[in-house]
């Protein structure tokens, strides 16, 4: 027995002596560390990963128990091209992987599969805005940047801070699931105001089009939107601060402190924006504070905490100018407030073997108030004039949840993802609407809604030769609509690899289902002067979605042309109705509608400094069934605010010491309504052109300027709500410390 133990000890000793420790660091083209990259370590000429790890804040991994020999490392990091290299231990024990900027088809994205993967292998339609592009654009809020992405149509009711909605592939504005740092930030049922979401310290934005409920659950009916905060990476602390101002009494200031040292990284940031606006009661202000901190617990475990808080106030003019005709004066006293707080704690564990585990817990607190305290434009219920009556709408939503995701990679061409989600949706809301209240008291009577939802999901990826397949399903237990199974399958095939000019042709197809839970008001009713009864028996709204597309690259991947056809069948859509006998109102699953169309995108690198992304979208919609509804929402009518023709253009120039961008959003005539009986049944088409630029007057001082609505055109994204005319901002940005 003693001899056996001695032999085992000798073997272990020899193993430790001849085992090599690899220290690999992942950096970008400027030698800055890349955190969060997925690194697979394999034996040379093998497809089974020995280790699958995620880089820490300093861009490094340190896999242990690797014997001397020949290996291959494969690196996937969002925003970069996929990287692969051979190395030999112990000679390459300290190895640096320098990532390159991706060609138009090589960009690595996360949202399509919930883990890093080159976009051309996802079988999905994904568009991105990277940190440099966002810096060029200097958007005030999320809607200011999204409008320049392919397939996105933005409708903002008003100007800065106005209610801004996203329409994708003919779906409703509530058919989009939005996340900030992994936290869902829409209300249950999909409501989200994009116009008050600031983008300070956002490093990356991804828009995934198509039904995506298999991976993301309720509300992901036509798109998923993901925002990712910047992480600190420089060993020396970096202090970034700046300020800008412009016409309309606009003032903006911001700052951040970030860095990474040892096991820790950090990014603490703040932002304040104020403007008086273009007309009466058109002011907007928003303050933001946040942090993104992480620590490496061990060579295989990493913990990250994210916190973000914003508080906005918006003057609401209401409807007053219809296609350039100012029929009414703007409302002088209506205003809207929104206060949002999110927190997310995420633990990533590598192993054992080819597994990666992600555990996260989050909470999102969302409060809104929209009120009008003075009837300055007229209110007389005796003649059914409710144009400018007193009202007070209050919403308080809290979403808290726990998520688990496990990624198993037995081969480089095979990956399985499993997950579990639990969410507590809790909310209080009311809608008080009266014709007179001299004391300003709107009463109480809040409605309470509560849902406890659970889900499990499974996804399988297979890539063999020219063929790629991604298939999965989600089983949902929702407290409102019960149990559902939601499938998705996406396949792509490389028709030809091509040559120097035609460098690759890929066909793709996807079938998916999407679901959307009822809003709290629809399920639990509304209090107030015009109440709605609760309906606990509402079904989930559904989308049956097909898409098929072609992708063609040119000149060794420098340019890409893609075209996709989509077909959406929406059913069980929820509509408000009234009992003709009791005159009580409530919500029912009544409507069906249809949307089909095409998306064409051309993008490329015109030169090493100039990038182009252009798109054209055609969308045809129709209401198939709307019992009891009248125009403009009757059976046979097109869906409101969905243009048949729209397009976008984005040019970005990056050089040493200076850069700039040109953005264009082109939206055709679309059906709309004033809902006041004035006869306005459409919103006119428009072309919005923005420009921006920056120049380094010193290596650490940057001068920048941005102009919105360069052509100074009148336009209305929502009929009755004129947008801003030409407006500009200019400022200075300072950087202290850092790399």
Task: Annotate each predicted stretch with a short phrase.
Residues 247-274, 279-315, 333-356, 410-416:
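Transmembrane beta-barrel wall of Gram-negative outer-membrane proteins
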Residues 29-30, 40-42, 76-80, 90-135, ...:
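Short, acidic, small-residue-rich periplasmic hinge/interaction motif at the N-terminus
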